[in-house]
Design a protein with these regions (language model features):
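Active-site or metal-binding loop neighborhoods of secreted/extracellular toxin and effector enzymes
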Residues: 116-164
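Extracellular structured ligand-interaction cores
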Residues: 29, 58-60, 128
């Protein structure tokens, strides 16, 4: 009898991001650290913002109907002919960061994409800050939590790579 393990959501996210050869490892860590905080470490793409709002933020990146990223995501689903999923949410961000979806790049700003990519060349910490500040732009960034999440993300990645 063989035992098969079911991949955790964070493992699935990591493996999906690693499929894109143009994504810098620092940027992958930054995306995952931000996702950890945005989802409360569940890495569940259906995560809904807690609170009393009638239009809560949603998903891996807490796409906010009031901030424009949610509407952009709806446009991306139409553009990519995809259904809502973790992969679709990740693909949208990757397509923006790799400048493969012009509408998304224009929405977040070419300069902001450049800042994130330049930060990723330096370190995962710089990339985490830049992605939060220039792409997500949360009301309360909790930057110390995002930076602390890098340690856990790196441990998870190390474990995933050891198993593979």
């Amino acid at each position: 009898m063989s035992s098969q393990s079911i991949a955790s959501p964070s493992e699935c996210i990591y493996k999906h991001l690693k499929k894109e050869p143009l994504l810098d490892d620092n940027l992958i860590v930054a995306l995952m650290a931000n996702i950890a905080i945005e989802t409360g470490y569940t890495f569940d793409y259906k995560t809904v913002q807690r609170g009393e709002r009638s239009d809560p933020a949603y998903g891996l990146f807490q796409l906010d109907p009031r901030g424009g990223l949610y509407d952009l995501y709806i446009d991306y689903l139409d553009y990519s002919k995809s259904d809502d999923s973790a992969e679709s949410q990740l693909n949208m961000m990757v397509d923006i960061l790799l400048r493969q979806w012009d509408k998304g790049v224009a929405h977040v700003g070419h300069g902001n994409v450049n800042k994130v990519l330049a930060a990723a060349e330096k370190s995962a910490e710089e990339a985490t800050r830049a992605f939060c500040d220039h792409i997500l732009r949360p009301g309360k960034p909790h930057m110390e939590r995002r930076l602390a999440a890098i340690v856990g993300v790196n441990k998870s990645i190390s474990t995933i790579n050891d198993i593979a």
